[in-house]
């Protein structure tokens, strides 16, 4: 059993969530209750993202930026793009709906 570091809530509206593999992600304070889950890192097309499993080892993969995008009311039938290209920057001003075209 490996314990992850507790999230860091700064006074500037940003919460840092510590992930597996020594990585971290940042979210806005409005989403900081998501820090209560254990998040890990996965790589897709060379970009790192935060995810967690629901329902055990063979359960569903919940991707952090898509969970935040849903809370923002973004259309999840689209891709969710990280404006700055950093898949671990999950602040709301860095997420937008985009097409794959």
Label the predicted regions.
Residues 1-80, 84-101:
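Conserved recognition-core residues within compact binding domains
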């Amino acid at each position: 059993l490996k314990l992850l570091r507790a999230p860091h809530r700064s006074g500037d509206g940003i919460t840092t969530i510590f992930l597996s593999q020594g990585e971290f992600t940042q979210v806005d304070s409005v989403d900081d209750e998501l820090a209560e889950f254990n998040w890990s890192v996965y790589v897709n097309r060379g970009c790192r993202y935060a995810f967690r499993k629901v329902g055990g080892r063979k359960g569903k993969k919940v991707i952090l930026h898509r969970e935040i995008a849903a809370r923002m009311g973004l259309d999840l039938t689209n891709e969710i793009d990280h404006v700055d290209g950093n898949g671990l920057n999950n602040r709301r001003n860095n997420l937008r709906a985009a097409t794959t075209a």
